[in-house]
Amino acid sequence: MKVGVLALQGAVAEHIRLIEAVGGEGVVVKRAEQLAELDGLIIPGGESTTIGKLMRRYGFIEAIRDFSNQGKAVFGTCAGLIVIADKIAGQEEAHLGLMDMTVQRNAFGRQRESFETDLPVKGIDRPVRAVFIRAPLIDQVGNGVDVLSEYNGQIVAARQGHLLAASFHPELTDDSSMHAYFLDMIREAR
């Protein structure tokens, strides 16, 4: 099973390491044409506005929309969550607009307010280690979106069919459970 990690920004190598730890084949994605060979795609963190601009410049917007429209699994972490959302609070235009949710950028504060915690995640039998760095949150979800995890009453992980979103960075820990969950989603989508 080939899982790509969009290599425009973010902890690409760390995602690849965890994909491979749970039995997937990790692929560094630098060109839109590479999507054709993939079973799933991770859009990692970074800065969502910059990621959006780079996606437009390098032809990823329509390519990723087409990939998702084929029913292939997409996982957005931190800024990647913002990129796949269909609404961003305080912003007129979404980037990919794939997942029926409204998100708020930098909801957990600045860099110095970053933290780690263990979260219960629906569908995973033990708490998941989560790193929050200038993390967004999910303000609202539409019908058909399943809330997977909350932190202090705020939504931090959700799923809509073949789409998965997490406010946190699962790749910055040694906990591979979110990546295992994503690989299970890819198997379901086949």
Swiss-Prot record:
Catalytic residues, per the record, are C78 (nucleophile), H169 (charge relay system), E171 (charge relay system)
Question: Which GO molecular function annotations are given, in alphabetical order?
Answer: glutaminase activity; pyridoxal 5'-phosphate synthase (glutamine hydrolysing) activity
Which residues does the annotation say bind L-glutamine? G46, E47, S48, R105, I133, R134
Family annotation (InterPro entries):
Class_I_gatase-like, PdxT/SNO, PdxT/SNO_CS
Q: Which UniProt keywords apply?
A: Glutamine amidotransferase, Hydrolase, Lyase, Pyridoxal phosphate
Q: Which Pfam families match?
A: SNO
Q: Which CDD domains match?
A: GATase1_PB
Q: Which GO terms describe its cellular component?
A: cytosol; glutaminase complex
Return the EC number: 4.3.3.6, 3.5.1.2
Keyword Signal listed: no
Which reaction is recorded as catalysed by this protein? Answer: aldehydo-D-ribose 5-phosphate + D-glyceraldehyde 3-phosphate + L-glutamine = pyridoxal 5'-phosphate + L-glutamate + phosphate + 3 H2O + H(+); L-glutamine + H2O = L-glutamate + NH4(+)
Keyword Electron transport among UniProt keywords = no
Per the record, the pathway is: Cofactor biosynthesis; pyridoxal 5'-phosphate biosynthesis
Which GO BP terms apply?
A: glutamine catabolic process; pyridoxal phosphate biosynthetic process; pyridoxine metabolic process
Per the entry, what this protein does is: Catalyzes the hydrolysis of glutamine to glutamate and ammonia as part of the biosynthesis of pyridoxal 5'-phosphate. The resulting ammonia molecule is channeled to the active site of PdxS.
User: What family, per the record?
Assistant: Belongs to the glutaminase PdxT/SNO family.
Quaternary state and interactors: In the presence of PdxS, forms a dodecamer of heterodimers. Only shows activity in the heterodimer.
Q: Which HAMAP family match?
A: PdxT (MF_01615)
Q: What is this protein called?
A: Pyridoxal 5'-phosphate synthase subunit PdxT
